[in-house]
UniProtKB/Swiss-Prot annotation:
Catalytic activity: dGTP + H2O = 2'-deoxyguanosine + triphosphate + H(+)
Keywords of the record: Hydrolase, Magnesium
A molecular-function term among this protein's GO annotations: magnesium ion binding
Needed cofactors: Mg(2+)
Assembly behavior: Homotetramer.
InterPro entries recorded: dGTP_triP_hydro_central_sf, dGTPase, dGTPase-like, dNTPase_1, HD/PDEase_dom, HD_domain, PHydrolase_assoc_dom
EC number(s) from the headed UniProt entry: 3.1.5.1
Entry protein name: Deoxyguanosinetriphosphate triphosphohydrolase
Gene Ontology biological process terms from the UniProt entry: dGTP catabolic process
Family, similarity comment: Belongs to the dGTPase family. Type 1 subfamily.
Superkingdom in the source lineage: Bacteria
Residue ranges occupied by any HD domain in the UniProt entry: 66-274
């Protein structure tokens, strides 16, 4: 396994700072401790406490929010990282793999990536994501504007993004932007949030660890088979493309490859949410522990004494009632289920990381660590299938998701006058903070948060010297990003209340 040197991957350089050096182990550790402080103290992490995990607008604090889920993922990620490093130590590979001064940073990068992994998610989870994409797809008609030549079927509602005869280069840009704006994705928004909006100036290694997918949002070409898993979702937007190119150079990553520690973050998320969703469903009385056991055993098939299902789920179920008076049967069951599941899946994830280390290190390993034909992965899949069949399609969940979809779609409708303004008028509104001819738009603009307005202004200034046609296209792009940034950054409750206020429903 020559060629594996984690010093080439774990870079402590920052995009907005001068190149720095750190010689001893503690100096390197301090750099990543600074990352921890920036992340933990960021507003994006605080907002996770009022964002949906499964149950939107949940008042029961025992049911998980995105924040409590992320804390659980952080702990599992730390455990997997420690397991991997311990195996490297036992095999006397620490120095050979360039990790002798990077043990603490290795763990810290994984932990903080786990804590951050959901910060780009909009209100109401995947339904909020769908609402944003559906709203923009209807107006962008990305498939009607593919390529460089106008099509008779093109139904784009934005004049500046309509393809025009004889404008090949501009049409390619228009097509890119139409696809990009129609592909809002929480993982891509996380990259935008930490770099362009919050400007946390994190190390390249720390941000590389949350670059879960490697496809740009504007991508419309066929996906290469060698990377069809890594590119199954958008990983970053056109707005952050230059930054991602810098990151790849700094971390020695080929195009479409992944940062090696990202595989650990992904495995920790898979392990954590599969148990959490089921525990929350029991807390919400969607089914009982006994019913849950029946659902899981049906998905597993024939259970034989000593198989993995029996050791993990069966062993937890057999503990019911054994500690009456000390804890409830539900708490008892999930305590043992969690311990048993983590105890089996964490070593399996660590082993998969090590067995596939050359491909994992290069970032070309085209699957998840917990995606193979093993009994451990079968167990994980049955947890997920039970959640899909019996939790996500529960009437209460579906009703709240429909409400969330309507809220996000409605907010986009409400703020759409800002997108309909001519470029010159919007530019004047930004410069003067008001526009006499656009009183409604002025008031909507005032509701946007300062950090989002500043990010737009900075982007607009950066493209100021482009030819006028290019400038108008990019200006609209960053204006649309401004609206997406603002609405996707809301908490569930704020989005719900804002929608009601602006619809005069209260």
């Amino acid at each position: 396994m020559s060629g594996i040197d984690f010093k080439q991957k774990i870079s402590f350089q920052r995009p907005f700072s001068k190149p720095s050096s750190a010689e001893d182990e503690y100096e390197i550790t301090r750099v990543f401790e600074s990352d921890r402080g920036r992340i933990v103290n960021s507003a994006a992490i605080r907002r996770l406490q009022q964002k949906t995990q499964v149950f939107p607008l949940e008042r029961n604090a025992a049911v998980r929010s995105r924040l409590t889920h992320s804390l659980e993922v952080q702990q599992v990620g730390r455990y997997i990282a420690k397991e991997i490093l311990n195996r490297f130590k036992q095999d006397k590979k620490i120095t050979a793999y360039g990790l002798d001064k990077l043990l603490d940073p290795f763990e810290s990068i994984v932990e903080m990536a786990c804590l951050m992994h959901d910060i780009g998610n909009p209100p109401f989870g995947h339904f909020g994501e769908s609402a944003i994409n559906d709203w923009f797809t209807k107006r962008m008609d990305p498939n009607g504007g593919s390529g460089s030549e106008p099509q008779s079927t093109d139904q784009c509602q934005v004049d500046v993004l309509k393809l025009c005869e004889g404008e090949t280069e501009l049409n390619i840009l228009r097509s890119k932007i139409r696809h990009d704006l129609s592909q809002f994705e929480g993982n891509a928004q996380a990259i935008r949030l930490v770099h362009s909006l919050l400007k946390l100036n994190l190390t390249y290694a720390q941000v590389g660890c949350i670059l879960k997918y490697t496809k740009p949002a504007y991508w419309s070409a066929p996906i290469p088979a060698s990377h069809n898993y890594l590119m199954k979702k958008p990983g970053f937007y056109l707005a952050e493309e230059n930054y991602v190119k810098e990151l790849r150079r700094e971390l020695n990553m080929e195009e479409f490859d992944r940062f090696p520690l990202t595989y650990i973050m992904e495995a920790a998320d898979d392990i954590s949410y599969c148990i959490a969703d089921l525990e929350d469903a029991v807390e919400k009385n969607i089914f009982s522990v006994e019913q849950l056991y029946d659902h899981m055993s049906q998905e597993w098939g024939a259970v034989t004494p000593g198989d993995l299902f029996d050791k993990v789920v069966g062993a937890a179920f057999r503990q019911l009632g054994r500690e009456q008076g000390r804890r409830s049967s539900e708490d008892q069951f999930f305590m043992y289920l969690r311990v048993n599941t983590v105890g089996k899946l964490v070593p399996h994830a660590a082993q998969r990381f090590i067995e596939n280390l050359p491909a994992v290190f290069s970032g070309s390993f085209n699957q998840a660590l917990l995606e193979d034909s093993s009994a451990a992965c079968k167990l994980l899949q049955i947890f997920k299938r039970v959640a899909v069949k019996h939790v996500f399609n529960h009437p209460e969940v579906e009703q709240l998701e429909l409400q969330g979809y309507r809220v996000i779609s409605g907010l986009l409708d409400i703020y759409s006058p800002l997108l309909a303004m001519p470029e010159t008028a919007f530019t004047q509104l930004v410069a003067d903070d008001r526009h006499r001819k656009y009183p409604i738009e002025t008031r909507l603009f005032h509701k946007l948060s300062i950090k989002h307005r500043l990010a737009y202004a900075e982007s607009a200034e950066r493209i100021r010297n482009l030819p006028s046609e290019q400038y108008e296209i990019y200006e609209y792009y960053y204006r649309a990003r401004l609206i997406q940034d603002y609405i996707s950054g809301m908490t569930d409750l704020y989005a719900y209340d804002e929608y009601r206020r602006l619809m005069a429903a209260e």
